[in-house]
Amino acid sequence: MINRQHIQLSLQSLSLVAGFMVWVLISSLISQITLDIHLSKGEISLVTAIPVILGSLLRIPLGYLTNRFGARLMFMVSFILLLFPVFWISIADSLFDLIAGGFFLGIGGAVFSIGVTSLPKYYPKEKHGVVNGIYGAGNIGTAVTTFAAPVIAQAVGWKSTVQMYLILLAVFALLHVLFGDRHEKKVKVSVKTQIKAVYRNHVLWFLSLFYFITFGAFVAFTIYLPNFLVEHFGLNPADAGLRTAGFIAVSTLLRPAGGFLADKMSPLRILMFVFAGLTLSGIILSFSPTIGLYTFGSLTVAVCSGIGNGTVFKLVPFYFSKQAGIANGIVSAMGGLGGFFPPLILASVFQATGQYAIGFMALSEVALASFVLVIWMYWQERMKTHTERNSQSIN
């Protein structure tokens, strides 16, 4: 059983790395792509954000299907399907090609819900936070592509760079054929029954909001920073890619730390600090005329989003152990959608005002609202615990 645990944790975590590497292909190479395909600023924002749509919405059925058929089959099918949009993008010569191919790249982001549904089955509840945190560190795949793809593209061209990812996908599909767990525990409760059990629970929607902000901030900065740093601060694509990779690395490496801390202390207390930090970072980014101050604000977002992501996914199986697949899918879908809207909002704000301050202040205000909600949830839990203890004392 121990070997089975470690094999699945390693294989599924590496699979998430591969999926996220593919997911951010367009945003990582957009500076080189626009040399061949002319795009307006609005079209660039749309093209870089479009993979997030399917990458978010597909997480709900993938979470459910993982519970029903197992991670082995779902990872295999996902990697095989990804071969088609990756090849399409490698021969793209129009805005339509980038939008159509980019939409189906979203499968790479959707695979997240496979592991967070599958892996807790192999471990006791007190380890769910750190296990999901380790798996979530597969986000580092976005850093790998963001840093490496522009460098490789300078040497061989962006189309050849994209084609290299076909090999990566084929390798991981084969790894799941060989080492995927054929005997994973399956849950065959109907999707209708699972949805009925969770959708009226306000905790599900609070967790969805929290992940909308923490993971949404991570995704939004990942897809927006490479082009933003080039356009706004005049950096070259390789330098912008390196800085974005640094942001991703900090956030990703702190995700397991968030899960570990949530296993050891109150997850809601941790989220208080997370949202307080995001509130502060939004204010800093709103008034960042220099690259130094902007870097500090971005790294604050990286720290808070990483710890917050790990903490939220400690809470999902804690509250919804019997409906983990559908609950994981809904919460992670909301997180993905949180990465879709900010780039479009920032682009619209910039076109209307010539600056990004209002867009970053919106991050601060939403984070502040979540901070208040977490405090409310924390005191509700305290009151519930106090009431239960009093009733036990009376009995």
From Swiss-Prot:
Any one of the GO BP annotations: nitrate assimilation
InterPro entries: MFS (IPR011701), MFS_dom (IPR020846), MFS_trans_sf (IPR036259), NO3_transporter (IPR044772)
GO CC annotation, single: plasma membrane
Transmembrane helix among keywords: yes
Family per record: Belongs to the major facilitator superfamily. Nitrate/nitrite porter (TC 2.A.1.8) family.
Official protein name in the record: Nitrite extrusion protein
Compartment(s) where it occurs, according to its Swiss-Prot or TrEMBL record: Cell membrane
Keyword entries, A-Z: Cell membrane, Membrane, Nitrate assimilation, Transmembrane, Transmembrane helix, Transport
Keyword DNA-binding: no
Organism of origin: Bacillus subtilis (strain 168)
Transmembrane intervals: 15-35, 44-64, 73-93, 96-116, 133-153, 160-180, 203-223, 240-262, 271-291, 293-313, 330-350, 357-377
Membrane topology (UniProt): Multi-pass membrane protein
Record's function text: Involved in excretion of nitrite produced by the dissimilatory reduction of nitrate.
Record-level Gene Ontology MF annotations: nitrate transmembrane transporter activity
Pfam families xref list: MFS_1
Domain of life: Bacteria
SUPFAM superfamilies noted in UniProt: MFS general substrate transporter
